[in-house]
Amino acid sequence: MKKLMTLALAAAMMLGAATGANAIDFKAKGQWIMDFNYGMHGDFAKSKAAGNSGFSRNGNHEDEFEATQRVRLQLDAVASEALSGTVFFEIGDQVWGDNDNGGALGADGKFVELKRAYIDWMVPQTDLKVRMGIQGIALPSFTTNASQILDDDVAAVSLNYQFNENVGLTAFWARPYNDNYGYTKQVAGAKPYENYMDNMDMFAVLLPLSFDGVKVTPWVMYAAMGPGMFGPDKYGASWSAASKGMQSGFKGTDWNDSYGNAFWAGVTGEVTYWDPFRIAWDVNYGSAAYADEKMNREGWLASLLLEYKLDWGTPGLYGWYSTGDDNNPRNGSERMPTVSANGNNDFSNFAFNGNPYIAREDVLGSTMVGTWGIGARLKDVSFLEDLKHTLRVNFMGGTNAPKMAKYVSDYTAYDKRGVEAVTGGGFGYDPIYLTTEDYALEVGLTNTYKMYDNFTVMLDAAYLALWLDNSRSTWGKNAMSTWTAKRYSPSTGWKTRKGAASSERC
């Protein structure tokens, strides 16, 4: 009966598509990016050839100079104001000359990816908007314009309702992970076992409030995680953003049988009442708890932005602070848990994940968790038509206890500490672990020229200096102290890039 019902439904959908085809309005848009990068010391290695391989960073090995391209194509099928469907493809990133991604001579690489695919519809006789499918989901942020907890594409059902011009409501259910570990698994010759609980489900509610000169959005999010979500064969895999951001990095003997519950809450907003003066803030809290308490993670992150818009540009001051690990590895981590921060951080486009195009970025990490910082910027400075410049200077440091540095090393299973290294399996390390004795300085200049309405040329240059404390109270007792002293005492990374983009922005 179920099969017959399925066939009937499919036939009805096909018939509807056939009879209503003339009423569908198809709209296409896209983005073409050509990028040319040159940089050195992406892993902060010194200049000696033996310790420096191109622009290695975050486990990626790149040449000092590389040319890259990416194409994004979006197709919208609009039946009415109440019903539409969208599919969004991405081709790339393709490194010129790289056969694995279709950039070598002859091309013909199989490198087309599905980025988003969803339908939008409205509940009849109401203003309730529903989006179902793989879509972009982001928690709110008024300072960085990119959530440090969740900002990425994910399979979800989202609801949006506007009560009046001042009050709205947004809710979603998202499933970032499921069925990645398999239903039957055998590890190291042991007896095969079944594994059904490898999913992660997130539920969130946001309440956007907008008044004259003031916007505030309080929000909450809960996530349930199955014990099979962190299976051993997924360590360091491409989907492992959650394993880096949701665990402490330490674990005991029952880590693979630990159900998890996570909770986040935040208040973000801005005041533009005294325009052109603007104040923006983000306050976020999060915790992730497991049956294995060593895996727990709990912390908060707050940021503040002050800026004043002038005719020629917008100068601004900003700062942030995030809790870091204390000196006890057995009580979990005091860093705020994160799911995937894949947005464009306005505070930094080199140290963190902030560049809107293809670029070398997140050299310190994809999020600001476990760090503090202050910065100044001149944004969108323009003295010539269609030419803009943005200058950033950031000074930052870590908030993790110096004692924790000795755990950033390899690990012998089930040693007397009963904990794994903070970098175990790629967990909890994104990618540089900064203590309260470690500091970094970033200087960046971004130049954009709008040559035509849909064609922009960008020239971007950035420099990052890192100082790690190699005394015995911090990294000197680390098992890798010789390695860190050679590579991080102190050193710098830098890049320069030129990019061209033609688009209706996707």
Regions found by a protein language model. Give the residues of each.
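Active-site-adjacent helical/loop segments in soluble small-molecule enzymes
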Residues: 354
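Long, hydrophobic, well-ordered secondary-structure blocks that form the structural core
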Residues: 148-151
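Long, well-ordered mid-to-C-terminal structural blocks that present hydrophobic/aromatic surfaces
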Residues: 294-342
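A conserved hydrophobic secondary-structure block that centers on an alpha-helix together
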Residues: 142-144
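Glycine- and aromatic-enriched membrane alpha-helices
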Residues: 349-350
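Beta-barrel outer-membrane channel/assembly domains of diderm bacteria
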Residues: 2-137, 157-171, 198, 205-214, ...
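Outer-membrane beta-barrel translocator/channel fold
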Residues: 175-191, 196, 214, 219-236, ...
